[in-house]
Amino acid sequence: MTAYKSGDPTTINRLYGRAKGKPLRQGQQALVDELLPQISMPAEGPITAEALFGEPRPLHFEIGFGGGEHMAFRADMLPDHGFIGAEPFLNGVAQALTHVSGDNGQHPPIPNVRIHHGDALEVLRRIPDGSLSFLYLLHPDPWPKARHAKRRMMNDGPVDLFAAKLRPGGEFRFGTDHAVYLRHALMVMRRHKHQFEWLAKDARDFQVRPGGWPETRYEHKARTVYGHEVWYFRFRRR
């Protein structure tokens, strides 16, 4: 039984955001039609490493993987681990498939990735408690208006769910370039200090990107085009 509270006003019961943008290019559509069904999550049943990859292995989950650069990089770096990602935006899924496919067939496909085109919360609810080694939430939609604050993924209900699904010693990584969301997220995590230990020892630990944490296209644009500062947070499940 998880600590996830479906009636909590700080709990979102579905992910908000757009589902599709500009039309897909021909190659992207081909990947959606051909590759996505091969590496999609099963429609029913518990989501475990054994069910997805045929053997026990450390399991990583990325919520809203954007263009998939981070997920593909980490999966390629850790071939003995299993990576799952959820993204409701079809164009992001298509971009991720380009990375996973080995840049449209120029390299061998990355075999240890599974994708869900849809709501990350649906996936989390099907993962047995204590199963995840890593959970990533990188640059989620900040929903800056106060009346939309309950739509933020960083709220008490979802964070309780994160804690339930991570194993003891597992790691939750959060990144943002939005100052309002930064303050909101830290307030939320402070309320969950009994579940998570913040791994920062000094300011550099959250102002400098850690090793093995690649810069995504979104992050690069935030820094270079908009001049945003980016913050990186690592929390260990107690």
From Swiss-Prot:
Keyword Methyltransferase: yes
Database matches in InterPro entries: SAM-dependent_MTases_sf, tRNA_(Gua-N-7)_MeTrfase_Trmb, tRNA_methyltr_TrmB_bact
Pfam families, per database record: Methyltransf_4
Enzyme Commission identifier(s): 2.1.1.33
This protein's GO CC annotations: tRNA methyltransferase complex
Keyword Transcription regulation: no
Residues the entry annotates as binding S-adenosyl-L-methionine: E62, E87, D119, D141
One MF annotation (Gene Ontology) recorded for this entry: tRNA (guanine(46)-N7)-methyltransferase activity
Bridged cysteine pairs (disulfide): none
Entry keywords, A to Z: Methyltransferase, S-adenosyl-L-methionine, Transferase, tRNA processing
Pathway(s) the chain acts in: tRNA modification; N(7)-methylguanine-tRNA biosynthesis
UniProt catalytic activity: guanosine(46) in tRNA + S-adenosyl-L-methionine = N(7)-methylguanosine(46) in tRNA + S-adenosyl-L-homocysteine
Active-site residues (renumbered): D141
Chain residues that bind substrate: K145, D177, T216, R217, Y218, E219
Record PANTHER family: 3-DEOXY-D-MANNO-OCTULOSONIC-ACID TRANSFERASE/TRNA GUANINE-N 7 - -METHYLTRANSFERASE, PENTACOTRIPEPTIDE-REPEAT REGION OF PRORP DOMAIN-CONTAINING PROTEIN
Summary of the function given for this chain in its UniProt record: Catalyzes the formation of N(7)-methylguanine at position 46 (m7G46) in tRNA.
HAMAP family xref list: tRNA_methyltr_TrmB
UniProt family annotation: Belongs to the class I-like SAM-binding methyltransferase superfamily. TrmB family.
Designated name of the protein: tRNA (guanine-N(7)-)-methyltransferase
Gene (name only): trmB
